[in-house]
Regions:
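A short, ordered amphipathic alpha-helix with a cationic face
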Residues: 10, 164-167, 180-183, 224-229, ...
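Short conserved motifs of the RecA-like P-loop NTPase core
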Residues: 186-199, 219-223
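Loop-to-helix "switch" segment enriched in basic
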Residues: 216-242
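Helix-loop-helix "sensor" segment of P-loop NTPases
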Residues: 166-193
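P-loop/Walker A NTP-binding region and its immediately flanking N-terminal helices
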Residues: 1-164, 170-171, 194, 208-211, ...
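Short polybasic/polar patches that bind polyanions
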Residues: 65, 181, 197
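Short loop-to-helix capping motifs
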Residues: 27, 201-202
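C-terminal helical "lid" of AAA+/P-loop NTPase domains
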Residues: 193-198, 204-216
């Protein structure tokens, strides 16, 4: 069994990563933008910016899945140098896709890519392989990425409007319940809501914390001293409202 397979089977953030756009917990305006690309049958060159764990990489992968595109993902915080472009990316981008469509290169955490070498070189790659390949870049800090890259990509900012936060937090509460039920971990709903609100909208952090606390076999008030006291009545109330609404439909 490969390291990648072990990671997907063990880490909850990978095991329960949404595989399609509809299952991503994001504002509808963002999901609609990606759905339009699926309908057109082709991705654009994209620069996705926003806070850690908010769903940028997840929806990029979901887009590739729905387009049935051949893709590779490179984490630039670990592999953000010019040699990566000259070897891995060039070899991938220059070959023909098995499916016949365009290939996609996902460059995760691209704000860690070297701004003096890799970033300027990528500008040329985007143009050189435009007939065969698209590039999706994710970043936490878009100001660390040179302007010529911005101008060659469609920039999508992952901002959550205040009016959407209760709905998304509630949706993630329900998602966490499914995860815990699947893993046979007991939980106190209020404690679960407190953990979500503490780290919202960093969904990756929330799942990682849940997995860490789950070692004890249950998510209950025993972890409150680590989480801190947070008023979460409105998120639990919102979740009950949504479930009630679904039952009426």
């Amino acid at each position: 069994m490969t390291t990648e397979t072990l990671t997907k089977n063990y880490l909850w953030v990978e095991k329960y990563r949404p595989q399609n756009i509809g299952d991503c917990i994001l504002p509808d305006s963002i999901k609609d933008t990606f759905r339009q690309m699926v309908e057109s049958g082709e991705s654009q060159n994209l620069l996705l910016s926003g806070g850690a764990g908010c769903g940028k990489t997840t929806i990029a992968k979901a887009l590739c899945n729905e387009l049935d595109a051949d893709y590779i993902m490179i984490n630039c915080s670990e592999d953000g140098n010019i040699d990566t472009l000259r070897t891995k990316i060039r070899n991938f981008a220059s070959s023909i896709s098995i499916s016949g469509g365009k290939k996609i290169v996902i460059l995760d955490e691209f704000d860690y890519a070297n701004a003096q070498s890799m970033q300027p070189a990528l500008r040329g790659f985007i143009e050189e392989f435009s007939k065969n390949c698209r590039f999706i870049l994710t970043c936490n800090f878009k100001n660390r990425i040179i302007e010529p890259i911005h101008s060659r990509c469609t920039c999508i900012e992952f901002k959550i409007p205040n009016k959407s936060k209760p709905k998304l937090a509630s949706a993630f509460l329900d998602r966490c319940k499914v995860v815990l039920d699947n893993e046979s971990i007991g939980y106190d709903e209020k404690v679960l809501a407190e953990l979500i609100l503490k780290h919202f909208p960093d969904f990756r952090r929330i799942l990682n914390e849940l997995q860490r606390y789950s070692v004890a076999g249950t998510i209950d008030t025993g972890i409150l001293t680590q989480i801190g006291e947070i008023n979460t009545k409105h998120i639990a109330k919102q979740s009950r409202k949504q479930r009630s609404s679904k039952r009426k439909c």
